[in-house]
C-alpha cells in the first residue's frame, strides 16, 4: 500500500519491517 511506499521512502527499509510487524500484530495484513 501507499504506507509501505511512503514509509520506505521516508524512513528506510526498516520502516517496512515495522509496518509488517504492526499489521501482523493488529491482524490487518
Curated annotation (Swiss-Prot):
Q: Which GO terms describe its cellular component?
A: extracellular space; secretory granule
Looking up InterPro entries in the UniProt record yields: Galanin, Galanin_pre
Chief localisation class: secreted
Q: Which UniProt keywords apply?
A: Amidation, Hormone, Neuropeptide, Secreted
Q: Report which superkingdom the organism of origin falls in.
A: Eukaryota
* GO MF terms, alphabetically ordered: galanin receptor binding; neuropeptide hormone activity
Q: Where in the cell is it found?
A: Secreted
Alanine amide: modified positions: 29
GO:BP terms for this protein?
A: neuropeptide signaling pathway
Question: Pfam families from the xrefs?
Answer: Galanin (PF01296)
| Cited function | Contracts smooth muscle of the gastrointestinal and genitourinary tract, regulates growth hormone release, modulates insulin release, and may be involved in the control of adrenal secretion.
The entry's family comment says:
Belongs to the galanin family.
Q: What is this protein called?
A: Galanin
Q: Which organism is it from?
A: Ovis aries (Sheep)
